Regions:
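Solvent-exposed alpha-helices and their adjacent loops that cap or buttress functional pockets
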Residues: 72-75, 111-113, 136, 156-159, ...
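Residue-level recognition of the N-termini of beta-strands and the immediately preceding loop/turn
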Residues: 115-118, 211-213, 242-245
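Glycine-rich beta-alpha loop segments
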Residues: 11-20, 28-29, 34-37, 43, ...
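N-terminal acidic, proline/glycine-rich, low-complexity intrinsically disordered segments
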Residues: 1-9
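C-terminal functional extensions of proteins
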Residues: 216-274
Length: 274
């Protein structure tokens, strides 16, 4: 009966040792140049290659896979995504509302077993920090999807360390914001907040993603920031598109709106009632 091959070979294969300088005095210097050359690095270890224009598609794929792998490892199936200005300080009333909202969501998901509903933010300061901080206050997991910027944006200290991710591409970051979102809560903010809000509104409008409750916190701000009724009057949107979002003022009203939205559709969020 033939014995299976051993894990280790008994004899070396050709090339397992470099050419001896006894055979060629110049071999050692030539070998050192080859081993130090970027071209000889394996592709996965060649940072220069991985950052070339031609490998952009690979980088996008890696950003998708890294975040997806980590979220699956932690069994994150549902998120409540919070957007808002990075510029708002702790003294802002909106900061306190966002913190309280994060606490409510965090409390509702505690000790619920698999697939609990978690806060997800952009991982930065301001409103993002407040929502992560509220979840942290409640002892709950929360997620931060930070972004590499020309000037470093550090993550806020309240994101769960194992769920703090950093992205190179806004596009892939926004993809992960949308992928598990069961609700979107948007506080006052600037261009970045508007971009994130309108991305979700467009995806819901076109049914590229299932509609989710979108709550704009601070009606007075939002009435001035954009005018959907004007868009309707100009024929740019349909009447039903006005129903893609609602307004709220408090953390409790925001959370209750989200819970009621899902309950009316017969698919309540997997969390305990507040």
């Amino acid at each position: 009966m033939t014995e299976p091959p051993a894990d280790e070979r008994q004899r070396s294969l050709p090339g397992e040792h470099p050419k001896s300088p006894h055979d060629d005095p110049d071999a050692a210097e030539a070998m050192a140049r080859i081993m130090a050359s970027d071209s000889y690095r394996e592709a996965a270890e060649d940072l220069g290659f991985l950052n070339e224009e031609l490998t952009r598609g690979l980088r996008l794929q890696l950003e998708y896979l890294k975040a997806e792998t980590l979220l699956r490892q932690h069994d994150i199936r549902h998120t409540v995504v919070v957007f808002g200005s990075a510029r708002l300080a702790e003294t802002s009333p909106w900061y306190e509302v966002a913190r309280e909202f994060g606490r409510l969501v965090g409390q509702s998901g505690l000790n619920r077993g698999e697939g609990c509903t978690c806060i997800m933010t952009g991982g930065g300061p301001g409103i993002m920090e407040a929502a992560n901080r509220g979840a942290h206050d409640a002892g709950a997991l929360s997620i931060g999807l930070n972004i590499t910027l020309p000037r470093e944006q550090f993550p806020n200290p309240y994101v769960t360390p194992e769920l703090a991710l950093r992205f190179r591409y806004f596009a892939m970051r926004k993809f992960h914001f949308a992928l598990r979102a069961r609700a979107l809560v948007v506080f006052p903010g600037g261009y970045g907040t508007m971009d994130e809000l309108f991305e979700i509104l467009e995806l819901s409008q076109t049914r590229k993603m299932p509609p989710v409750p979108v709550v704009l916190v601070g009606e007075r701000f939002w009435r001035r920031a954009f005018d959907p009724k004007f868009l309707l009057e100009q024929g740019m949107i349909d009447p039903e598109d006005l129903g893609l979002f609602v307004f709220a003022e408090s953390a409790d009203a925001t959370w209750r709106t989200i819970l009621d939205w899902h309950a009316r559709r017969g698919a309540p969020l997997p969390c305990a009632p507040v």
